[in-house]
Design a protein with these regions (language model features):
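ATP-binding N-lobe of GHMP and related small-molecule kinases
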Residues: 90-188, 206-215, 252, 261-264
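Short cysteine-rich clusters marking metal-coordination/redox-active sites
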Residues: 59-62, 77-80
């Protein structure tokens, strides 16, 4: 992308001044009876400045030449749709970054690139982080987290999303502050980091390129992680490949979830390695859940829950205990999400879910009662 040499507002000022000067010089020439040579040179000089301003006027976001002089077009780039005037760009935007749960998760063979083939049905839930983006004058991009994160800001997936967006979209003329308010537990299999990154991409679209499509954002999201493309649209989807190939599914019927995050954590790489070492595993599939979604049958969906990672839990894991506790407290069914360690239970009624959550919260402080979204 070529960087803008003259911004829209400057080009417009130059063009207006050029026109005014040409009119003034034309009038003076007539009044003072100056030579035609003077008039001609004045007009040529003014037109030269005018044309240069038009030719070198580029979109501040995508860097493409705007082709037409600014007085003869609207205030939006014809290529990317970004506002061309500073005061038309929003200064900040707030996005919800919702968590997900895996209704099914089947891990297949390991691919040559090191990833595993997977088949999973994911659905968004009402537990969310809040991501706010602010445009600032710099001198650099910033990440502010509450609570603070231990990793370097540059390694955070939100900052990587920022770099991917502008690497694909084009140069930016200012800097961005990302404020991240965390609620989703980490190392839980709830996709919190991936959802935050997707929220950054959506927010940058609002700030800089309002006509960018979800498909374009999903292509960027693929560079950030297997789960990130899902969070661009959310809802309910079947993911295959390494998780990036998405097929939209019918919405989940209305229901409530109790999500429990115990203190234990399961490194994703270690869980995949455990599956690779397993002599035999049942290998679940998504057929029952897909059929239940088609009929909007919550009981059928609950009956079809499965997750291959539950077969290779470390010894002494609290996951089976939590799963059984949720069932005893009225959940239609319960299981671990992702590679863990969060567990969720499905409930028809909010009241039943709230009672179960209040009981489990005594032993597991990170317990949440949320709707499906």
């Amino acid at each position: 992308m070529k960087k803008p040499l003259i911004n829209f507002k400057t080009a417009r000022i130059i063009e207006i001044v050029s026109i005014v000067l040409m009119l003034i010089l034309s009038g003076l020439t007539a009044l003072l009876e100056l030579s035609k040579t003077f008039l001609t040179s004045s007009i040529v000089g003014g037109l030269t400045v005018y044309v240069v301003a038009a030719l070198f006027d580029r979109c501040p976001c995508c860097g493409r030449n705007l082709d037409r002089v600014s007085l003869l077009r609207d205030s939006f780039c014809p290529s990317c749709g970004a506002p061309l005037e500073e005061d038309l760009l929003p200064r900040h935007v707030e996005e919800k970054a919702c968590a997900k749960v895996n209704l099914t998760l089947s891990v297949r063979e390991k691919r040559p690139d090191g990833y595993h083939e997977v088949e999973t049905v994911m659905t968004g839930v009402g537990l969310h982080d809040t991501v706010t983006l602010y445009r600032n004058a710099g001198p650099w991009d910033k990440l502010e987290c509450d609570p603070p994160v231990t990793e370097r800001a540059g390694d955070n997936l939100c900052m990587k999303a920022l770099r991917v967006f502008f690497g694909e979209f084009g140069p930016k003329k200012d800097f961005v502050t990302i404020r991240l308010e965390k609620t989703i537990p980490t190392q839980a299999g709830l996709g919190g980091g991936s959802s935050d990154a997707a929220a950054v991409l959506r927010g940058l679209r609002t700030l800089y390129a309002s006509n960018m499509t979800d498909t374009q954002l999903e292509k960027m999201a693929e560079k950030l992680g297997s789960d990130v493309p899902f969070f661009i649209r959310g809802g309910t989807a079947l993911a295959t490949g390494r998780g990036e190939k998405l097929k939209a599914l019918p919405d989940m019927p209305p229901c409530w979830l109790v999500i429990v995050k115990p203190e234990e954590s399961h490194p994703t790489a270690a869980m995949y390695a455990a599956l690779d070492r397993a002599a035999a595993r049942t290998g679940g599939n998504s057929r029952a859940v897909l059929a239940g979604l088609e009929r909007s049958d919550l009981s059928a969906i609950a009956a079809g829950l499965n997750n291959d990672f539950q077969q290779v839990l470390p010894e002494g894991s609290s996951i089976p205990v939590i799963v059984e506790a949720l069932r005893q407290l009225g959940a239609l069914n319960a299981q671990m999400t992702g590679s863990g360690s969060a567990v969720f239970g499905l409930f028809r009624r909010r009241e039943d879910a709230e009672v179960a959550a209040s009981v489990l919260k005594e032993d597991y402080p990170q317990t949440f009662c949320v709707p499906q979204v």
